[in-house]
Amino acid sequence: LNNKNIAKNLNFTTAQGKGVFYSFIYNDIFYKCFFVFEENKIQFCKQIKSSEYKKLISESGEFLTINKFKSFPINLGVFNNELELEYLKETKLTYNLNKPKTYVFNFGKIDGKSLNFLFENEDSRLIIKGEFNKVNFDFKNNVLNTKKISSSRYDKNLLTGCVNYFDTKFANVTINSNDMFCEDSVNIKNSLGSIKKIKVENSFFDALDLDFSKLDIDNIIVNGANNDCIDVSFGDYLIKKATLSNCGDKGISIGEKSKLNLEEGTIFFSNIGIASKDSAITKVQKLQIQQSNICLSAYKKKREFSGSKIFVENLDCKKYKIKTKVDKFSKIEIK
């Protein structure tokens, strides 16, 4: 970035020659650059907005054709000012997360406890690992200064969630989240087991994100998410009941080869009720949707996947603009 021969013009957007785009974060600033193979040099680097950086991250794995040359954009991650990890050293009932750190909660197996986590710094993140049986988790945002919230969606360790469960085993667990400000209020990855109830209220962005997991969930309640209420990918999910309201974009988004079985769903006030994409298979027994622009949508988004399928046995959709939207690769079947 200190090389004066590298163009830094924000209007410089045309890539010339055969090369690859790459992105990174440097000192809290987002960058997108283009490297030309034939000349073995960086043609240009430019600052980009966080929304464009997020789009680059979400489209990882998709190839681009530039000047008749196919390449995959690369994300280099974050340089400088990485958040420090702090391992919580003792088990207690309430934790105050008041420093700009990523806190790690990993105490092995825990039974029958109620654990409370208070977020008191906009840069605090939480990683949870372990085995939990009949444990109640409660997460609350106590941050008073919300000026930095718009830039807090991704932390410097590229954690998307305020709360991040990794490699976790659940048994009859409940999760409650209020007023979270990250890209995902609650993110669960590489985990399995049964969850009794998840309740998420007032998310600045996505409410609940499930990835690479196999989960049985009795009840999900989401009220207020500026983006998706539920987002699942690369996994196998059974949800017995979901009650979702005031979802800024999608009520439920299912993608990337996921299998979702929803027994009963109620979705009020969303842009799209259920969106299934990219080789995902979605099966719903009973579904009620009200005040959505689109009730059901099935499509292929990424080149490396095929279309998607939605099967609904009983659909009651009211006050909508489009009932079903499906592309040529996908299928929606309503009995």
What are these regions (language model features)?
Residues 2-335:
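Extracellular beta-rich repeat passengers
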